[in-house]
Regions:
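Bacterial N-terminal signal peptides
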Residues: 7-16
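N-terminal edge beta-strand
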Residues: 23-42
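Short acidic/polar inter-strand loop motif in beta-rich domains
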Residues: 68-70, 108, 190-196
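Membrane-proximal low-complexity regions enriched in glycine and acidic/polar residues
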Residues: 77-179
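Juxtamembrane interface at the cytosolic side of transmembrane helices
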Residues: 223, 233-252
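Short, aromatic-rich amphipathic segments at membrane interfaces
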Residues: 173, 196-226
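Short edge beta-strand/loop segments characteristic of extracellular beta-sandwich folds
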Residues: 48-54, 171-173
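Extended, hydrophilic extramembrane loops/domains of integral membrane proteins
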Residues: 177-207
């Protein structure tokens, strides 16, 4: 019995350094710009992430929005003829935005594991349909088509090793459809397909200028916002009708 206990203790001690290595934290990441301003002219942007990983590592960089629940409707054939919305489907623990970029030495299967395909393990489909995995796969395809989820969303460049570390720089192409909130930027140091170290930073995105004014108006003064929106819509319709009337009279 004593020998068995000693063997078990030896195995635990042998595994301890490996667990410690797996939990290594990278030096602080530097993100440029440190915050994202969504103004009237915002149409997407490039986010640069720089840091250092242990020498001999490859790098995966990810940007993820806050987890949320998406409510959608599943389409199916009715009477075997018409495609219609059949029932509601909710996808929980799904990030609003998810971008991934990997250095050239990362194997495709490893990039997929830590990229969009890997989200299938965390996103849950809430529906009566028994084939939930297929629904999650379709959800991922939809988000990719909307350019909210992307693999190979940029480039990761490794610099020469120095003092046991490899500096890296990543450029992620942030989509134009970005909502205000806090976004997580994460760098993964990869060796032999496994994470040996990781680092994280937070990026805040916020409305500025006219979008901020309209958002505040909508939330804080809903009635006034509704009236102004109606007036603008009516005026826009009148202007367009005048333009068409003028073009018709000019044609005669």
């Amino acid at each position: 019995m004593r020998r068995l206990l000693l063997c078990a203790l030896g195995l635990l001690l042998a595994a301890a350094p490996r667990a410690a290595a797996a939990a290594e934290t990278l030096p602080p990441l530097a993100a440029t710009p440190p915050a994202i301003s969504i103004n009237s002219l915002y149409n997407g942007m490039d986010l640069t992430v720089a840091g250092k990983v242990p020498a001999g590592s490859q790098v995966v960089v990810r940007l993820a929005g806050e987890p949320t629940t998406f409510h959608m409707k599943e389409k199916g054939k009715v009477f075997g003829i018409l495609w219609m919305n059949r029932e509601k489907v909710s996808f929980s623990d799904a990030p609003k935005v998810f971008l991934e970029a990997a250095s050239e030495g990362v194997a495709p299967e490893t990039a997929a594991k830590y990229g969009v395909p890997g989200l299938a393990e965390r996103i849950k489909a809430e529906t009566s349909d028994p084939d939930k995995a297929a629904l999650v796969a379709e959800f991922l395809k939809f988000q990719q088509a909307e350019k909210l989820y992307r693999d190979s969303a940029g480039q990761v460049t490794l610099a020469p090793e120095a003092d046991g570390q490899t500096p890296f720089s990543a450029v992620l192409h942030v989509p134009s459809r970005l909502s205000p909130g806090t976004y997580s930027v994460e760098a993964l140091a990869i060796k032999d397909g496994a994470i040996v170290a990781r680092g994280q930073a937070a990026i805040n995105a916020s409305f500025v200028g006219a979008p901020a004014f309209l958002a505040n108006m909508a939330f804080d003064h809903g009635t006034l916002y509704g009236i102004l929106a109606s007036v603008i819509a009516i005026l826009g319709g009148l202007i367009i009708s005048r333009i068409f009337q003028g073009s018709k009279s000019g044609a005669h």
